[in-house]
Amino acid sequence: MKLTLIQPSVGKIANKPYIKSWTMEPLALATLAGLTPKEFEVELIDERIDPLPEFYNTDIVGITIETYTAKRAYSIAKEIRRQGIKVIMGGIHANLMPDEVIQHCDSMLLGGAEGGIWTQMLNDFKNNKLQKKYDANSYFKKELDHVTPRRDLYANKGYLPLGLVESGRGCPFTCEFCAI
């Protein structure tokens, strides 16, 4: 099976390429790829660098969504879903605006993907049981210590020569007013 992970660009200006923004490695997507079961072939498309294909040769797509890329992410998801491909969305905007995001995808992840929830989502997809929403707060997060981001997916993409590292993840508390 094939999983395609997409980092949307900020947007598009008429008759010009997509707006370029920071070209640092999308560490969240490489971490997600590291959490993906080995039976999935993983492809990374970073729209800030790569053109999007007209037709997708994949089984399922994951799109990371930040508030400033939301409009573009919804447009990408609409086209992919039109091709009959399931779309999963997650990221900070999904946590902040879940009622909005869920209208544009087949499944949504709230919170971080570690702790077994990402594997559960992909297994549910394989078994035709993909749920509309998954809440990572209901999963025990023990998997992160063993996650190696798939930096091989960055090859030949022209990212800034920086090695991004996460020194911490989230927060152990579940305050209702916080998006972390």
What are these regions (language model features)?
Residues 1-180:
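Acidic, low-complexity intrinsically disordered segments
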